[in-house]
Amino acid sequence: CVDPSVIYSPLSVHISRLPNRTIKYLAIHFTAGSNSKPGKAKDTKHVFEQRKASADFCVDDRDMVQFNPDLHNYYCWAVGDKKAIGSNGGQLYGIATNRNTISIEICSTCIPATSTAVSHSNHDGWSFTDAAINNAVKLSKILMKKFNIDKKRCSKI
């Protein structure tokens, strides 16, 4: 596991083996889920087991969870090596790929951003609690240090 504060819950499906992969980027996404209450990050594993998608990590209000069994030798399917229909891909499309990027999913909430429980929202209308954002920042710092990832190589939500 990447850090003692991270829960290790490895996936056995929807991951690919790549021995000694080079990690250059950090991508942060959101789950578009119903809430960020404690335990939701761990529950996200079941979603990834059913879909042809995955992420290296997921965070909620309490937990940071690692789904990638071995960051040095496996990659998850989160960054979008293929363009979605009607999409031009992101700014780093074709540069930051599943093979060279670590992905973090932040559990989002449907609570309106005007609620006192939520202080962050994104352009798609999903909201994030301070606790979930703080866990994403904490995990990002751990990963950036461990893999020498410059802040210019980190995506935004």
Where are the model-predicted features located?
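Active-site-adjacent loop/helix surface patches within enzyme catalytic domains
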Residues: 1-150
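Short, glycine/acidic-rich hinge or "gate" loops at secondary-structure transitions
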Residues: 149-157
